[in-house]
Amino acid sequence: MQFFTVATLFLATAFAAPSVDTNGNGIAPRLAANFCPPGLLYSNPQCCQIDVLGVADLDCVSPPSGPSKCKTFAGICDKIGRQPKCCVVPVAGQALLCTDPVGANN
């Protein structure tokens, strides 16, 4: 029983550790876009329709094209009438934990 607890704790810690690029400069670009906060939590760019109290976002979709900068991310979401957000993994269009992209003027 203790083995499974220790093994689970070890694996959870290993998976939660951020990936470092080859130069040792921080988060690898493949994990989070430069317009989302660094780390693993808010690494999913989403275009959301409804923002509830700045925390929960409803009716979210992935951007129709891959944004490369914050301004292009905002422009892509504006074209479909939504707001750019960086979210935790959304489930069924409900992104319950989201934040504004880095450098956004919302």
Curated annotation (Swiss-Prot):
Disulfide-bonded cysteines: C36-C86, C47-C77, C48-C60, C87-C98
Subcellular location: Secreted; Secreted, Cell wall
Main location: secreted
Lineage: Eukaryota, Fungi, Dikarya, Ascomycota, Pezizomycotina
Name of the protein in its database record: Class II hydrophobin 6
Family according to the record: Belongs to the cerato-ulmin hydrophobin family.
Signal sequence region: 1-16
GO cellular component term of the entry, any: extracellular region
SUPFAM superfamilies, per the entry: Hydrophobin II, HfbII (SSF101751)
Function: Aerial growth, conidiation, and dispersal of filamentous fungi in the environment rely upon a capability of their secreting small amphipathic proteins called hydrophobins (HPBs) with low sequence identity. Class I can self-assemble into an outermost layer of rodlet bundles on aerial cell surfaces, conferring cellular hydrophobicity that supports fungal growth, development and dispersal; whereas Class II form highly ordered films at water-air interfaces through intermolecular interactions but contribute nothing to the rodlet structure.
Pfam family for this entry, one: Hydrophobin_2
Subunit structure: Homodimer. Homodimers further self-assemble to form highly ordered films at water-air interfaces through intermolecular interactions.
Biological source species: Trichoderma asperellum (strain ATCC 204424 / CBS 433.97 / NBRC 101777)
InterPro entries assigned: Cerato-ulmin_hydrophobin, Hydrophobin_sf
